[in-house]
Amino acid sequence: MTRTVMCRKYQEELPGLERPPYPGAKGQDIFEHISQKAWADWQKHQTMLINEKRLNMMNAEDRKFLQAEMDKFFAGEEYAQAEGYVPPAE
């Protein structure tokens, strides 16, 4: 049986992650409040940010920026976009 969570991003009951994606309290919070769909959407957006903004994951400031953007993304706040990116029409 699939575990469901009340997704913070989409504000509905959706299938949850199989395990925490990070160690510690942050990973547990994501595990308990973020759906598989929201996590997959974040991973796509994160990849775009890393590539378009040329972020270096060895750089602590770049990791800190990405962490802050992840928090905004899941909270439904305004978050950084790749400049010039237009999402495909659905």
Curated annotation (Swiss-Prot):
GO terms for biological process: cellular response to oxidative stress. One of its GO terms (molecular function) is iron ion binding. Keywords: Iron. Gene3D superfamilies: Fe(II) trafficking protein YggX. It comes from the Bacteria. GO terms for cellular component: cytosol. Coiled coil: none annotated. Could be a mediator in iron transactions between iron acquisition and iron-requiring processes, such as synthesis and/or repair of Fe-S clusters in biosynthetic enzymes. Belongs to the Fe(2+)-trafficking protein family. This is Probable Fe(2+)-trafficking protein. It comes from Pseudomonas putida (strain ATCC 47054 / DSM 6125 / CFBP 8728 / NCIMB 11950 / KT2440).
